[in-house]
Curated annotation (Swiss-Prot):
The gene is RPS14. Belongs to the universal ribosomal protein uS11 family. GO terms for biological process: ribosomal small subunit biogenesis; translation. Its main location: cytoplasm. This is Small ribosomal subunit protein uS11. Component of the small ribosomal subunit. Part of the small subunit (SSU) processome, composed of more than 70 proteins and the RNA chaperone small nucleolar RNA (snoRNA) U3. The modification Phosphoserine is found at S14. One of its GO terms (molecular function) is structural constituent of ribosome. There is a cross-link at K59, K61 (Glycyl lysine isopeptide (Lys-Gly) (interchain with G-Cter in SUMO2)). It comes from Sus scrofa (Pig). It comes from the Eukaryota. SUPFAM superfamilies: Translational machinery components. Keywords: Cytoplasm, Isopeptide bond, Nucleus, Phosphoprotein, Ribonucleoprotein, Ribosomal protein, Ubl conjugation. One of its GO terms (cellular component) is nucleolus. The keyword Cytoplasm applies.
Amino acid sequence: PRKGKEKKEEQVISLGPQVAEGENVFGVCHIFASPNDTFVHVTDLSGXESICRVTGGMKMKADRXEXSPYXAMLAAQAV
């Protein structure tokens, strides 16, 4: 006899800072725009802990559009 699929509970893992709801978190947004790509990197105030890192290439599929202003806007919105 076939067994039914077992349902697995998904655990949500938060890698960012632990804050209460409605509380603000401050960070530093480092933006590097090269001729080939745009990087948006958010760190804590000391610059040692990364909170988020997004590139234009992560948002665009075509290599020629990685460095476009549209890809940089999508990367900034993802942060």
